[in-house]
């Protein structure tokens, strides 16, 4: 599935924020085709075919948190705001990383490192956590255990 081909299913819902794991580079997407005007976007990836795309609409803007740690490349702390609201957002696409950490461990350690970012009145954590009960093992990171 390509987001540029499947976006029509989402836009009737009039989203303010979209987190799109496995999203191709935004440069490949004709944003003018969207029925909703994109206010801002952020994309990170290792190749042009797969990355993490964040899109905002309805006046919301995106700013990368100043203490972003690329050790957690696909766990993006972003400040999302419009004229009246501000949210701290963690957009996630947990995937295999060097060092042998499980997906949920990687997420858990990132949330620990971003503790001060998460200490905000309005926090959203969303995306593809790649977590499933059938994969659960005893984690070295207990706050993420199910």
What residues fall within each predicted segment?
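Active-site metal-binding loops of divalent metal-dependent hydrolases
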Residues: 1, 23, 94, 128-129
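Short, flexible loop segments at the rims of nucleotide/cofactor-binding pockets, characterized by
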Residues: 1, 65-68, 100-105
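Short, acidic/polar
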Residues: 2-12
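Glycine-rich phosphate-binding loop signature in dinucleotide/nucleotide-binding domains
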Residues: 12-13, 82-84, 116-121
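Proline-aspartate-enriched helix->loop->beta-strand connector
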Residues: 14-20
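Metal-dependent phosphoesterases centered on the DNase I-like endonuclease/exonuclease/phosphatase
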Residues: 17, 33, 106-146
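Structured beta-strand-rich core segments of catalytic domains in phosphoester-bond hydrolases
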Residues: 21-96
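Internal catalytic-core helix/loop-beta-alpha segment
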Residues: 78-80, 89-119
């Amino acid at each position: 599935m390509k987001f540029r081909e499947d976006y029509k299913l989402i836009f009737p819902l009039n989203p303010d924020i979209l987190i799109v794991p496995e999203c191709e580079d935004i440069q490949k997407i004709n944003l003018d085709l969207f029925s909703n005007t994109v206010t801002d976007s952020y994309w990170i990836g290792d190749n042009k075919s797969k990355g993490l795309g964040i899109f905002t609409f309805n006046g919301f803007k995106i700013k990368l948190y100043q203490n972003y740690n690329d050790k957690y490349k696909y766990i993006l702390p972003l400040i999302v705001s419009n004229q009246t609201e501000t949210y701290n957002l963690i957009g996630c696409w947990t995937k295999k990383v060097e060092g042998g950490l499980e997906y949920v461990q990687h997420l858990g350690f990132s949330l620990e490192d971003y503790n001060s970012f998460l200490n905000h009145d309005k926090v959203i954590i969303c995306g593809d956590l790649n977590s499933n009960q059938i994969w659960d093992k005893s984690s070295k990171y207990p706050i993420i255990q199910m």
